[in-house]
Design a protein with these regions (language model features):
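A short SAM/SAH-binding and catalytic strip from SAM-dependent methyltransferases
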Residues: 103-116
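Conserved class I S-adenosyl-L-methionine
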Residues: 1-36, 47-51, 66-71, 152
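C-terminal alpha-helical "lid/dimerization" subdomain adjacent to the S-adenosyl-L-methionine
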Residues: 5, 12-17, 137-198
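A short acidic, Gly/Pro-enriched loop at the edge of an enzyme's catalytic core
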Residues: 90-105
């Protein structure tokens, strides 16, 4: 679709200020913990690629949107890594991988656009090995009753139309908790350089607590 191709073309320029001011550092800090066999869901245009450390053995990057995936494939082809990188068209809701095959799953700015966040998180848990980790950066809904939450609710529909289906008012923390992930270890951050309605973030690594639920 034309709208998908346009969004894929403007995605990196639109995020550029936020990447320089905050998100690039957030990505680097989070992905320093990646190791072993890694799956990144909703990899988009591949902005995480340059941040993966050499502790990764193999990286699979999945992106269901064809226009985004075309940009991702070009980025993969243009970057040298000490590990193999495989591009998959799989959506997060229906991952074509056996149970327990990944040491780490990465989700950065993905769950806001997932067609079914609950199913996506169930799939993440399924493909993680026992003791594996979910590394995530997700923007979230403002505190209940806050001015920000009211603004997000008011602008949710036009923002979703503009931003490729992104739900600025989604309660992602609730989805994580409902899926059995412990959210206590997540820290809150701010996405500087981006509109206020997507500025609140949760960031963290969920490890063995995934399997204690």
């Amino acid at each position: 679709m034309l709208v998908n191709r346009v969004f894929a073309a403007i995605y990196d320029p639109f995020l550029a200020l936020g990447e320089r001011r905050s998100m690039g550092q957030q990505r680097a800090g989070l992905l320093a913990a990646a190791k072993g066999d890694v799956l990144e869901i909703g990899a988009g245009t591949g902005l995480n690629l340059r941040h993966y450390p050499d502790t990764v053995n193999a990286l699979t990057v999945s992106e269901p949107d064809a226009a985004m995936r075309a940009v991702l494939q070009r980025r993969v082809a243009g970057i040298a890594t000490p590990f193999a990188v495989t591009v998959s068209p799989a959506p997060a809701e229906a991952l074509p991988f056996p149970d327990g095959v990944f040491d780490v799953v990465v989700s950065t700015l993905v769950l806001c656009t997932a067609g079914d966040p609950a199913a996506s998180l169930d799939e993440v848990r399924r493909v993680l090995r026992p003791g594996g980790r979910l590394l995530l950066i997700e923007h979230v809904r403002g505190a209940d009753g806050s001015r920000l939450a009211r603004r997000q609710r008011r602008l949710a529909r036009p923002w979703r139309a503009f931003a490729g289906g992104c739900r600025c008012d989604q309660d992602t923390v609730r989805f994580l908790s409902d899926a059995g992930f412990s959210v206590a270890s997540l820290r809150t951050e701010s996405w500087a350089g981006m509109p206020a309605i997507v500025s609140p973030l949760v960031v963290g690594s969920i490890g063995d607590d995934v399997w204690a639920c």
